[in-house]
Amino acid sequence: MTDRLKGKTAIISGGATGMGGAASRLFAAEGAHVAIIDRNGNAAAETVRSIRDAGGEADHWTADVSEEDAVNAAVAGVEARYGAVNVLFNHAGTIVIKPFLETTVEEWDWLHAVNVRSMFLMTKAVLPKMIASGGGSIVCTSSISAVAATPMEVLYDTTKGAVHMFARAIAVEFRDRNIRCNAVCPGFIRTPHGLREVAELQALGVDVSDAAIAAQQGRIGEPEDVARAALYLASDESSFVNGAHLFVDNGFTAI
C-alpha cells in the first residue's frame, strides 16, 4: 500500500460489511484511522478486529445513521478519539424492491431516511470541524440507479437521484472552504445487498440474469472495485475532482 490516507481520520457509515467493509479495510491499509458507524455493531466489531489484526487502526460506533441524536453522538465520539474528521464516506444505504403501486408512504419515508437523510445528518455533523481543520473529502455512495431506472425500484432510484445532487450541491457550496464532495456510483456488485437485489428483481420478472448483467457491464463487480474508487475520491490524488459522479459499472451507463 502507498499510505494515501496516512494520518487521516476517516468515518465510513455502513462500513461493517459489503462495499463499506471493503472500504474500511482498504482505507485502514492506506494509513487512515478508520471509524465505522453502523447499526450492525457485531459486524462492525468483526471488521475492526480484522483491520487491527492486519496492523491497522480502527474502531466502531453503533448507530442508526438516519437518527440525528445517534449521528451526533457517534461523530462526537469519533472526534473525541481522533480529532477532526478528514474523510467522510457516506455509504450506509438499503433498498426497497416491489411494484410501485404496492409501495407505501412508510416505505418511501423509511428509504429516504436511510439513504438520503443519513447523508444530510452525517455531513452536517462532520463539516464544522472538518472546515476548521483545513478541509477534507466527502464521498457519497450513489448508484447507476441515479441515472438508469430499473422496474420495481422507483423508491430506490429516487433516493439515489437525490444523493447524486446532494454530492454536487455540497461541492459547490463548500468548495472555497477546501471541501470536496463526490459520488461513487456502483453497478451490480457481488455483496449481500447486491445479490438480494438481483434475486428479488428476478422473482418479479426483471431480467437480471448472469447473461443480462454480462451484456450490461461485462461481469458482476466486486466490493473492492468500489472501495478503490472511493479511495481515489477520498485521497489527495483527486484534489482537483469536486462535484463528480464516478461510475463503477464497467460501461453500464455508457451504453
Residue locations for each model-derived region?
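Short, small/polar-rich loop/turn modules that mediate ligand/substrate recognition or access, typified
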Residues: 89, 175, 180, 241-243
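Active-site loop immediately N-terminal to the catalytic Tyr-X3-Lys motif
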Residues: 98-101, 148-154, 176-177, 218, ...
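Substrate-binding pocket helix/loop in short-chain dehydrogenase/reductase
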Residues: 99-100, 107-109, 211
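C-terminal substrate-recognition "lid" of short-chain dehydrogenase/reductases
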Residues: 120, 135, 219-248, 253
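Active-site helix of classical SDR
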Residues: 123, 159, 167
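Alpha-helical segment proximal to the catalytic Tyr-Lys
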Residues: 128, 172-176, 239
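Residue(s) in the substrate-gating loop at a strand-loop-helix junction
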Residues: 143
